[in-house]
């Protein structure tokens, strides 16, 4: 093992507050893997929550593993150092169970790279009795885990707070077992659990046009449809940062979840669908959390699909102020922005507020079911100016269904009007206040009304970005940031693919993550998964899951969107 890498890991752990170290003797050992860098993974509240819940079990030792920083990859290769845990610097092969927490489809390739680096067979079918059991959780696991199915012994479908202890109990209950039998007995004990998907227990058949013909269980005790695991009582588990480190993307700011789900029903939004029903933590529960946070931190970031819709947001802001805690909110809806809320943010030191109009015209906002008017956006700017919050960040998407050139041109035009309402004069007589446009390429996601829509042509998306950037250059205080449309195309492939995409993922992992080259060498057809409209009667790769959203309701919303109709109620 590289002493340089080991020393870096020890330095990271020594800079943390809240790290758990346990003796291994007699305990179930679990490697909790975030397949991205330490800074990204430590900013993920779900990852921290599962780490906390597992280590709260006395018979478990859970340690973290991250994908190496770019500057460390060469050192891993040069010294043949496999991925290892932060807490004890043990290699992945030493653990009983390996759990990948996957939030972004782009991390699929990193996950397989880590298995390769560890010397663990990447395909579940190739692992033997001496290999760790490999599982996957996170939002990608219950949107569409099929591209990763070949690599996983099992998948946690849904919210993991309760099911992790049941997984541990199943592992303990599979002992004693005959030589080589424990893995099979463990998987058999998992199959009846709600929220557990064992890919190897299903056969996928393909028919004419390479479409899925059926997904069938291979045994009578295997459910035909895998039900999502849903946390019934969000107050039962406190969801806040348990590990603090200056190396995370958010630095010393603690994160606090106010609830799960969103009732708005935006037609493009995965999170608003798969985390239903909406569940808010009680004000009293959050009050207790804030009191604990305030003992060690003075900055907190509120986390939720739509924080400004929290029913007691005004009361919560007052609780935070009473404890002298500065608050950050990732994004706010213009139609739920109040004077009291903006005033609280200003007192908390906010310099930038973020909103997500998503589209440049009210027509297209109606199509995507983001019912925010231009006037509401202007009024939000007036509030920011009145309370001295100078900067605004707005999220927009291009490539949305029914989008026209006029919709794209409207983005910088709307931005100019927002900037005009936002800016005030500084002491030198010049306007201060900046507007950032964050423009992303729309990726149709499973479990949304837009799951039948095609992904736009990357070249067309690049042209649209050029149009927006050229128009924005005329305004000095507007900045445009965006992702590469070809990276969005990769995300579309991984989000919408089926089990056949595993070959591409494994190929890219073998090419050290060079997915562009992998796309050229793969014998599959990426456009089949990305650029093709799906038919209403088509079996989708994720149809053998039930996340609480009815396909018929999503289809009705898709038809209404194409008719540019936005009803008052969300699809259920």
Model region roles, listed by residue range:
Residues 1-22, 26, 30-32, 465, ...:
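Radical SAM enzyme core and accessory elements
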Residues 2-31, 38-39, 205-255:
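N-terminal [4Fe-4S]-dependent radical SAM core
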Residues 32-36, 54, 242-268, 351, ...:
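N-terminal pre-triad scaffold of radical SAM enzymes
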Residues 32-33, 106, 288-393, 397-436:
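Conserved SAM/AdoMet-binding glycine-rich loop
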């Amino acid at each position: 093992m590289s002493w340089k890498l080991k020393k870096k890991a020890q330095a990271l752990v020594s800079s943390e507050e809240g790290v758990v170290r346990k003796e291994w003797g007699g305990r179930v050992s679990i490697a909790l893997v975030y397949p991205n860098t330490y800074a990204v993974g430590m900013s993920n509240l779900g990852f921290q929550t599962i780490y906390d819940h597992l280590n709260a079990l006395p018979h478990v030792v859970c340690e973290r593993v991250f994908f190496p920083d770019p500057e460390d990859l060469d050192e891993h290769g040069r010294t043949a150092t496999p991925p290892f845990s932060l807490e004890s610097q043990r290699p992945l092969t030493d653990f009983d169970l390996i759990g990948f927490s996957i939030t972004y489809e782009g991390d699929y390739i990193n996950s397989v790279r880590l298995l390769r680096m560890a010397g663990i067979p990447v395909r579940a079918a190739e692992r033997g009795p001496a290999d760790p059991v490999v599982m996957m959780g996170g939002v990608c696991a219950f949107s569409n885990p099929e591209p990763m199915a070949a690599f996983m012994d099992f998948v946690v479908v849904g919210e993991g707070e309760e099911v992790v202890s049941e997984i541990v109990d199943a592992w303990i209950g599979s002992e004693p077992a005959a030589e080589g039998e424990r893995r099979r007995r463990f998987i058999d004990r998992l199959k009846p659990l709600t929220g557990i998907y064992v890919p190897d227990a299903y056969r996928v058949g393909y028919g004419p046009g390479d479409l899925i013909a059926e997904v069938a269980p291979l045994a009578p005790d295997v459910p035909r449809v895998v039900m999502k695991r849903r946390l019934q009582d969000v107050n039962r588990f406190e969801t806040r940062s348990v590990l603090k480190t200056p190396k995370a993307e958010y630095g010393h700011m603690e994160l606090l979840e106010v609830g799960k789900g969103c009732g708005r029903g935006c037609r493009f939004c995965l999170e608003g669908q798969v985390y239903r029903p909406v569940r808010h933590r009680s004000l009293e529960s959050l009050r207790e959390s804030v009191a604990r946070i305030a003992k060690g931190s003075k900055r907190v970031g509120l986390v939720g699909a739509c924080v400004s819709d929290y029913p007691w947001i005004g009361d919560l802001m007052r609780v935070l102020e009473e404890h002298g805690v500065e608050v950050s909110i990732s994004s706010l809806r213009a139609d739920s922005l109040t004077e009291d809320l903006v005033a609280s943010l200003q007192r908390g030191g906010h310099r930038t507020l973020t909103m997500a109009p998503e589209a440049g015209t009210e027509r297209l906002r109606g199509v995507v079911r983001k019912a925010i008017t231009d006037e509401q956006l202007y009024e939000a700017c007036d509030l920011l100016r009145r309370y001295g919050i100078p900067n605004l960040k707005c999220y927009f998407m291009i490539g949305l269904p029914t989008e026209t050139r006029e919709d794209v041109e409207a983005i910088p035009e709307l931005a100019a009007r927002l900037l005009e309402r936002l800016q005030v004069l500084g002491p030198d007589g010049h306007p201060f206040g900046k507007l950032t446009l964050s423009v992303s390429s729309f990726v149709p996601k499973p479990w949304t009304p837009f799951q039948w829509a095609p992904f736009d042509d990357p070249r067309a998306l690049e042209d649209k970005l050029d149009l927006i950037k050229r128009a924005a250059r005329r305004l000095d205080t507007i900045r445009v940031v965006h992702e590469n449309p070809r990276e969005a195309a990769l995300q579309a492939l991984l989000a919408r693919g089926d089990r056949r995409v595993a070959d591409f993922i494994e190929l890219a992992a073998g090419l050290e993550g060079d997915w562009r080259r992998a796309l050229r060498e793969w014998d599959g057809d990426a456009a089949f998964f990305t650029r093709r409209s799906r038919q209403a009667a088509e079996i989708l790769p994720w149809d053998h899951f039930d996340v609480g959203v009815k396909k018929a309701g999503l289809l009705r919303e898709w038809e209404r969107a194409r008719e540019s109709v936005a009803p008052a109620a969300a699809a259920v």
